[in-house]
Amino acid sequence: MLLAQINRDSQAMAEFPGGGGEAQHVTLCLTEAVADGESMDTMEGMSLQAVTLADGSTAYIQHNTKDGKLIEGQVIQLEDGSAAYVQHVPKGDDLSLEDGQAVQLEDGTTAYIHHSSKDSYDQSSVQAVQLEDGTTAYIHHAVQVPQSDTILAIQADGTVAGLHTGEASIDPDTISALEQYAAKVSIEGGEGAGSNALINESESEKKMQIVLSHGARLPIKAQQTNEKAFRCDYEGCGKLYTTAHHLKVHERSHTGDRPYQCDHGSCRKAFATGYGLKSHVRTHTGEKPYRCSEENCTKSFKTSGDLQKHVRTHTGERPFKCPFEGCGRSFTTSNIRKVHIRTHTGERPYYCSEPGCGRAFASATNYKNHVRIHTGEKPYVCTVPGCDKRFTEYSSLYKHHVVHTHSKPYNCNHCGKTYKQISTLAMHKRTAHNDTEPIEEDQESFFVPQPPDEVIKGSQITYVTGVDGEDGISATQSGQQLALIAQDGTSHVAIVAQDLSAFHNSETGPQHSHNLGGSDSRPVTLLATSNGRQIAVQIGEQQSLEEAIRIASRIQQGESPGMED
């Protein structure tokens, strides 16, 4: 008999639509329940009422005695063909944390949730894993169940008396959910275990001791069965999974089946999982319900997994360790670790199909960026008015966008200094701290374009046109110059930086200046063309040399840049 329970929880594994059009974050927890007659004793203010399902099996509707009425259940058909009751338990009913909840790991295997503080365990024995919704959990081989209201019991032959069998074996089919739970995790009992199940594990068998709310202890034995009973039959695969559902999801990687399709406008993108579709839909709606709680950080994200990854930019946590002996590197996400491992194995699974190319890549991102070299596609567009620059890579757009803002997203983990570009941060760490460790660019996943009015606000640009002078290049006091070839291939432009007062003192001739933000003297960029014309562009603190080139180019073409530049 299965008890299927759904809890509203901010860290839920799935979402079901609720009343009022709002989505409810829920978790689905399947456990076995002990039946004694037609109802069960009250446990921590909750009671269970037996209900016979359509297939003849028995399920239980959980009843919160404080409400004075039963919470209505709903029959659902599970992926493996079985049926169970689902019920919504409000978050305040002290059942929001469910131990024994089955979740799918990134490799397709099943783990069972136990809520506890990671800091209470030896960190060397804690392994980070990524769940299917992108969040990170930690595996420990000896954990303590903290909940005092966990419903965890088994049913044999329909009565409690059937449990008093001593050394007798229990049919695994009648206790499948609990047996899987025991086969996966061993739990060390301790003080304050209350009414929880205490499970001790040996190599040959699983010995389980069930502690009910009234204190009766029912020792039993259950033979350990195969943990992964569902095998992939595709040639060359043979992967094993604990449930039919997880096998079915895995098989989509062979078949290419993507049953979840986006119906927003003309999008029609399809996904292998409902969670993937839900995350994608938020790119259309702009919904970002997961907000960073760090002080002075206003970023929010489409998924809880993205938020969790972002938080590590504040904490510096790198829970995913490279398993290769002697490497010692660790990473903020399991995907970055997976790509890193390929530097040890030499694996490059992504091959370019362009005739005559033959290049292969370790990561899907690098492969996609490479393909755009052949196609000429530049899908990433700068949203700042008047810019309209396009890029083949998202990382290039991210790096470009900081020229429009005061943002300095890269911070030194040694001294706290912040930088606009990751290359500048890397140079600082090498020279100031002798740190040559490569810097991950995963922060780029959390780039949120700044609104155009925020970019325009505070912009101070002055440009001077029509400055006559000798052919050639005017050098700065430091003598630094940069040559640039125009698009026509003939007009050589030299870029020279000097301050505005020096420019006025050294040059004579008609000048036309436009000050958009103030009269203060700021450094300018002087561009001298081969035809004798020179253009000086004064840029604000948030502008860059790249912006100066763009503005000067428009001036040389006869345009008059306005505020939108």
Curated annotation (Swiss-Prot):
Pfam families: zf-C2H2
Record family assignment: Belongs to the GLI C2H2-type zinc-finger protein family.
SUPFAM superfamilies found in the cross-reference section: beta-beta-alpha zinc fingers
GO molecular function, one term: RNA polymerase II cis-regulatory region sequence-specific DNA binding
Zinc finger (C2H2-type): 230-254, 260-284, 290-314, 320-344, 350-374, 380-404, 410-433
Keyword terms: Activator, DNA-binding, Metal-binding, Nucleus, Repeat, Transcription, Transcription regulation, Zinc, Zinc-finger
Recorded GO CC terms: nucleus
Compartment annotation: Nucleus
GO annotation (BP), single: regulation of transcription by RNA polymerase II
Function summary: Transcriptional activator. Activates the gene for selenocysteine tRNA (tRNAsec). Binds to the activator element (AE) motif of the selenocysteine tRNA gene promoter.
UniProt-recorded name of the protein: Zinc finger protein 143
InterPro entries in the record: Znf_C2H2_sf (IPR036236), Znf_C2H2_type (IPR013087)
Source organism, top-level taxon: Eukaryota
Gene coding for it: znf143
